[in-house]
Structures are given as structure tokens and as C-alpha cells.
Amino acid sequence: MNSMHPETLMVHGGMDGLTEAGVHVPAIDLSTTNPVNDVATGGDSYEWLATGHALKDGDSAVYQRLWQPGVARFETALAELEHADEAVAFATGMAAMTAALLAAVNAGTPHIVAVRPLYGGSDHLLETGLLGTTVTWAKEAEIASAIQDDTGLVIVETPANPSLDLVDLDSVVAAAGTVPVLVDNTFCTPVLQQPIRHGAALVLHSATKYLGGHGDAMGGIIATNSDWAMRLRQVRAITGALLHPMGAYLLHRGLRTLAVRMRAAQTTAGELAERLAAHPAITAVHYPGLNGQDPRGLLGRQMSGGGAMIALELAGGFDAARSFVEHCSLVVHAVSLGGADTLIQHPASLTHRPVAATAKPGDGLIRLSVGLEHVDDLEDDLIAALDASRAAA
């Protein structure tokens, strides 16, 4: 099926067997436990699943923490889109990141090389070493020299959160050598970027964002090879981090409209970035699709478009940023991203508050997640807020 176009895969991925079952959409199975055939085979099934294996035909799924059919459908669909062997879904994006780090620690490779900026929660988790990892923060050009004998992962996010910096995945994978590369692909989604095609071993999504697309379901998912999938499922089973069946249903449903949502929001974001760049209160607009912001030519080679995230830098630092955000009326002041409505936030105060002072976003930087509203209405609201914040200064 993965020979089909992505738009077709988004609609039909993970939908196998529905016609035979006499239904058009997957059922939501909320069972927390499942009957087992007998004592011996039930025990075998439990051990098989608890050690990270996939459910075998005819076996009992035993317990929802070990295996859930709706979650498995969502995983199948995302794996096809990311050109991966398998995918493993979790309760949140941070649960997915935690599982990857725990799997690295369990393999005796607790050292992580990471390129900033990352999502603030990922940065915080790595910086604390809470899971037994150690981290070397490196620039893209420093990855090869930062790798040690016990390095288990190289972690990057592109475009980066919240600066929209672009990372060359071909370069990163070459520098990492035999060390697996984990790419946070939340901002791009598989519509715009497929990191496995560039050699990444693991592709992580906060499925809460664009994959779900409506701000009403939380989840995380990692697309990867079969070896890593087994390791991640074992961590998931032991830690109890399984995605809830209702969340799996909503996220899987979100995939069916992902391409049209992503491209519509991207078109608006590109137009909005150009319009905002002319405002005197803004010192810089960061958006991959703007002229001069992709010097290495990653658009077209790695990404098929600039996405729907924008970062703005305001003259006047924190006070200007605070006033701007608080004067918005249509655009919602909230964390998260990738939903139908446009969201605005001040990363240094919110998502990136725990990040070390030397790596924290500037006080004048604002992150904008562009939604599905008309570009003229968004422009009117943002320009009015910029003008009001200047007048109040």
C-alpha cells in the first residue's frame, strides 16, 4: 500500500479489514482486559507482548496496556506515511521521548548528543538527566566530535522549536555514523518531510499537534525499524504509557485530513510571514519559505514546503512581546500548535521556560502556529495588536 501517494495513504492507512467486518470506520474498543484461551497460552501471550513483540494472529491481546487494536491501526497508518517498518504510539509526545531515552539507557548507551533548539520539554528532560542519560549539546557541525563510545542517540528537531532553524538531516546522519538519529518531525509532519528517507532511525511526533489537528486529543508516536519498535513497545508496556483508545481513534481520524490541513495552513503562513515582515515593530520574521532563510537549499531537497509555524522577533524585548500577545483578540494566546485555530505564545515564558539561560529563546521572540482562518483576518488582528503594543510603549 505504501506505493500509493501520501494523500491516499492518509485516507486509507490502517483501515484494513473494515469491509470484511461490515463497517466503514474502525470501532472504538475500550476493553481494558481480554479473554485468554487457556492458562498456558494466556501466559505465553502475556510474556510475548510484555517483552515488546507484536500481537500474533489468533493470540489474546490479554490487557490494554500490552496491546490495543485501535492504537495498532493508528501506528500502521503513521508507519506507512513515514516509510518506516513500524510505529509505536504513546500517551503523549513526552512519553514517546521518554521511551526512546529509556531504551538507550537500557542498551548501555546513555549518552545523548542533541542539537539545540529543541522543544522545551525535550530540552528539560535531557538537561535534568532524570532518566539516567547524560547529554552533550552540540551544534550541527560538532556532532561527529561529540559522539562517545556510549552514545545511544543523536537528537535533532527540524524546523527547530521555536526558532524555525533548519537542520540538514543528510549531514546529521553522516556525522552520526553508526549512532541512531532521532528526528522530531512534529512541525513538518510526513506531509512535508520524511526523515527516514534521509537515514534517520527514529521519527518522533507529538501527535497532539498536526496529526490530530483539532486540539482535542493527546498522543505521541515514533516511527522506526522493527528492532527499535520492539524495544519501545517493551518500555511502553512496563511504564504503562499506552495511548488511550479514544485518543488513538481521534488521532487516526486526524490523519485522514492531514494533507489538506497542512497545505492550507502553510499557504496562509507563507502569505502572513511576508506581510508581517514589513511592520516596523518587527525586527525579524523567521519562516523557512522566506527569501534568504534556506541558504542550504533544504526546501525541495529535504522539505517540500515551509510549514505553518512562524517566529517573530519584536523590538522592545519582553515588554513589547507581552503587550503584543495580550492585544491579540482573534489569535489565541496558548501553548501547543497544529490545530485549526491560530495560536500565539511567548516561548521564553512558557514552553521553553525550563531551558538553560544560555540557550533560552530571546525575550522578544514570539511563536505563531498558523491555523485555517483567512489570512486577511489574521493579518488584521496581528497588525492591530502590533500597533496597539507600540502605542502603549
Curated annotation (Swiss-Prot):
Residues noted as binding pyridoxal 5'-phosphate in the record, renumbered to the chain: 63-65, 93-94, 206-208
Positions contributing to L-homocysteine binding: 119, 367
EC nos: 4.4.1.11, 4.4.1.2
Molecular-function GO term, any one: cystathionine gamma-lyase activity
A matching Pfam family: Cys_Met_Meta_PP
Keyword annotations: Lyase, Pyridoxal phosphate
Subunit and partners: Homotetramer.
Descriptive protein name: L-methionine gamma-lyase
Organism, as annotated: Brevibacterium sandarakinum
